[in-house]
């Protein structure tokens, strides 16, 4: 995810904290470069809309939250987040440009990094008929 953020002007990344085991809790903001430059104004417009009856969304981008893999033993979501993030960072053409001009995506690649690591460890040590206890083989 850091590489995507470094390579694309559509993505910013921030560490929102860390898990019990010390893994980072990342949040990517994915949108057009134009929206990134106005992100504080967009945030304020959305906050103001919660305090009024203004339901007009035609003049501001919508905000979407995408979170992947809350259950550690279901790794496909976090694995898919890499591909989804890459598509949003690198795709070209009018369709992706229109999407990112009209949407701010708050992108959480793994709700549960500790559980994902626990499952990966389990899968790598228990997936074979012959258990391998040698720690450097994991």
Question: For each predicted feature, which ranges?
Answer:
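Surface-exposed loop and adjacent secondary-structure segments within mature catalytic domains
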Residues: 17, 28-32, 42-46, 51-54, ...
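Short, contiguous, well-ordered secondary-structure segments
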Residues: 24, 40-41
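Second-shell loop/turn segments in exported
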Residues: 67-74
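Short, solvent-exposed loop/turn elements at domain surfaces
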Residues: 35-39, 74-75, 116-117
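Divalent metal-coordination and catalytic microenvironments
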Residues: 22, 69, 107
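A non-catalytic alpha/beta surface segment that caps or lines the substrate-entry region
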Residues: 1-33
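Sec-exported extracytoplasmic/periplasmic mature domains
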Residues: 2, 6-9, 85-93
